[in-house]
């Protein structure tokens, strides 16, 4: 481990995680459900750590907790969908945000794309992606994905998350 990395690790030990999480909550984000196809069953996870990475090629990234119950399935998938939720889809977000909730949901309206990724209906936008790679940093795994198809709806309002609350 180099000196800079060791220095950063010592600094982070001094930062209270509760307050650090509170500080990060001051950044308003959109809300997504990342979904994969596992033997023709819908598996999803609510994620607000979604970001554009590159326009050329079209790349995006998101991260999941290393201890997430379906992390192995996400690491092993080839294709996935990033569903950007609209303001009226708060219950979908809550369903997939639960830590110990069942992963297979039958009450979510969706269809499978040409690459068999689950696309949640009536979203603000949907991105169909091919997973390029993933890497572990801290307590999360960062997924880098190439966008291969997308849809969007200009007539919907976004679901936002700020200060640990939906807005």
Language-model regions, residue ranges each:
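Basic, polyanion-binding surface patches
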Residues: 5-167
């Amino acid at each position: 481990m180099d000196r800079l990395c060791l220095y950063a690790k010592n600094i982070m030990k001094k930062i209270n995680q509760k307050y650090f999480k509170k500080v990060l909550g001051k950044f308003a984000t959109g809300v997504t459900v990342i979904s994969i196809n596992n033997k023709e069953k819908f598996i999803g996870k609510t994620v607000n750590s979604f970001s554009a990475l590159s326009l050329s090629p079209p790349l995006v990234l998101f991260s999941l907790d290393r201890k997430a119950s379906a992390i192995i399935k996400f690491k092993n998938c080839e294709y996935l969908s990033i569903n950007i939720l609209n303001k009226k889809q708060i219950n979908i977000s809550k369903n997939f945000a639960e830590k110990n909730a069942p992963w297979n949901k039958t009450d979510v309206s969706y269809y499978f794309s040409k690459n068999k990724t689950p696309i949640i209906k009536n979203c603000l936008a949907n991105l169909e992606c091919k997973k390029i790679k993933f890497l572990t940093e801290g307590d999360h795994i960062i997924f880098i994905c190439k966008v291969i198809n997308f849809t969007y709806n200009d007539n919907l309002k976004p679901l936002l998350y700020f200060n640990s609350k939906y807005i």
